[in-house]
Amino acid sequence: MPRLSWCAALAAMALAAPAGAVLAQSAAPDAKPYQVEWVYRVKYGYQEEFWRIFQKYQIATLDRARELGYVASYTVVRPGLHTSEDSRWDYRIVVTFTSQASASHRGEVERALFPDKATRQREENRRWELTLNHWDLPIREIDPHADPE
């Protein structure tokens, strides 16, 4: 009997180790936050359709990534006034990941949330059809009183 208990304890530790390692990686004390700004310009007249799809997949993925500790926070903004077409944007999302490494988990989180790959791809392809321009830009805050870098 004692040998069986020892084996069961060893098996339990082996199964728990990967989960603990993942938590330790996402909460590393020396990891610095990593910010990325996603900017989207959408075809005129299609902002609502774009946003519904974006909410379904991207916002849900960001919410789950925040629950898992990969995302510290995110902010979504829209412009308050119209601009010229060459500088127009419709949505800016600033995502603060807990570290640069944590930014790489978006795909796995999305696949876990939305296992129907065909539907996800079809709907996300539609969102990209509605997107005229897009970029992801790593950004960083600076001290306005510090010397230039």
Segments and roles (model prediction):
Residues 9, 53, 105-106:
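Generic alpha-helical secondary-structure signal
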Residues 1-11:
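Bacterial N-terminal signal peptides that target proteins for export
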Residues 37, 41, 76-79, 96-97, ...:
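Active-site-proximal beta-strand/loop segments in catalytic clefts of secreted hydrolases
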Residues 29, 60, 64-72, 86-90, ...:
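An amphipathic, aromatic/His-enriched active-site/gating alpha helix that lines ligand/cofactor pockets
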